[in-house]
Amino acid sequence: MKRNTIDIITLGCSKNLVDSEKLMRQLEANGYKVTHDSDKPQGEIAVINTCGFIGDAKEESINMILEFCQAKEEGKLKKLYVMGCLSERYLKELALEIPQVDKFYGKFNWNELLADLGKAYKSEFAIERTLTTPHHYAYLKISEGCDRKCSYCAIPIITGRHISRPMEEIIDEVKLLVSEGVKEFQIIAQELTYYGVDLYKSQKLPELIERIANVPGVEWIRLHLSLIHI
C-alpha cells in the first residue's frame, strides 16, 4: 500500500473517462500520486467511477465495488469512494447496501471528494486533465445530458437536461491540449448535434468544428455521434 497514492478506476464510456482525467489532475495538483485502472489496489485510497446505463454495466460496476470492498476488509486499502452514473442514479440504495464504501458521490459533485480529503478544488486547473489516452489524441466533451425522451434510454434520468459548454472554454481546452502534444480530437457528448441550442439558441456544432479545425496543431477531428439531427 503506497502512501499518498490514489487509484482511479474508470468504467463505462469516454465521457466518464474525461471526468476521471479531470479528477486526476485535481488530485495531482493537491499533491497526490495517481494511478489509473490498476488491476489491484496500489494506494491507500481508491475511487471507482461507475457506469449505470445498462444491466451489464451496472453489474460490472457492482462487481468492481465489491472487489475493492474485499481489498479494504483485507487491509489492502484504507478508503474507498464511488462516483459516476451508477451512484448518481442509485446513491441511497448503494449507501444502504454497501456500507463498506466510505462515501458515494454522483456524476457531477465529485469535487466534494477533494473537500472530504481535506483538499481544495483548484479552479485554475478547471480545464486541465491528466490524459490516460495515447499522447497523440484526447476526448473532448462539449456538453452534458440529453433533452430526448427515448423510452429505452436512462441517460436523461441520470445526467439531466442538455447543457452545452461555452465555446470559448472548449477552444481554450483544445489549445492547451495541443500544447501538450495532442493532434487528434475525438468530440463526445450524449447528443453532439444539440450543441449550442441552450447557450446560443441554435445548433452550433458546425461552427465549433470549424473553430477547432482552425486551431494550429489540430490535425484530425472525429465526431462520436449518437444521433444525426442537423
Report each predicted region and the residues it spans.
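Proteins enriched for Cys/Gly/acidic motifs involved in redox and nucleic-acid/cofactor modification
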Residues: M1-Y195
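S-adenosylmethionine
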Residues: L199
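Alpha-helix-loop-beta-strand connector modules within alpha/beta enzyme cores
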Residues: S202-W220
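Conserved small/polar residues in nucleotide/adenosyl-binding loops
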Residues: I228-I230
